[in-house]
Amino acid sequence: WTLREVLRTRLRLLAPFVPFMANELHEQLTGEPAEDADWPEPDPAREDDRTEIEERLVERLTDDVNDIVDVTGTDPDTIRVYVAADWKRDVFDAVREHGPDRGAIMGAVMDDPDLRERGDEVNQLVGDLVEFVRERPDEELDALTSVDEGAVYEDASEFLAREFDAEIEVYAEDADPEDPADKAGDAVPFRPAIHLE
């Protein structure tokens, strides 16, 4: 069904540029010429904010790797992607819950003894995440809270491997990853650390 819908839509969109071929193919596919078919419109039932967010995360990761490759002039054999530790995600959740009020956020996160031990590191992360949250609409932030970032990059690893002709390894920062360049600690929620080798 999906392939049929994609073909029907593409043929209709091609009709102004290659009318004869598009009409013939559209008629074979649907029984009516492309010129008589309605112009395709987006179907709101098929729109999914979470899927679009996940796609943007992969796109941003791809852009970041391309930037690193361009700057360093390397052709990596292995690309390691480090996803932020769970405690950083907890800080993101606190920022999301308390809004841009750093005092309220710090009060909430410092109630957690594990986060209190990380004092300065948490303070720096809160500043970065407050900026991140301010730049995004609530709908996007709502979708981000339900995203499993590690799973997104794992699912995209085949695409990334083809894109960069390299082996892709995805690690969680707090899962004792292979980290020869000590990059894992640089990961923040929705902005993974990257190491090329």
Task: List PLM regions with ranges.
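Acidic, turn-prone loop/beta-hairpin segments
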Residues: W1-D63, Y82
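Short glycine-rich, basic-tinged beta-strand/loop micro-motifs
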Residues: L3, T72-V95, G127, E131-A143
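Active-site lining segments that contact anionic ligands and/or coordinate catalytic metals
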Residues: R8, G31, T74-R80, D165, ...
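Ordered core of a single globular domain
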Residues: L11, R50, T62-T78, A85-R102
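C-terminal, active-site-flanking charged/polar segments
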Residues: T30-G31, G99-V109
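Short, solvent-exposed polar/charged micro-motifs at secondary-structure junctions
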Residues: D43-D48, R89-D93, D179-K183
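Ordered, soluble secondary-structure elements with a strong preference for glycine-centered loop motifs
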Residues: D48, E52-R56, F92-A94, S146-G150, ...
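C-terminal edge-of-domain segments
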Residues: G107-E197
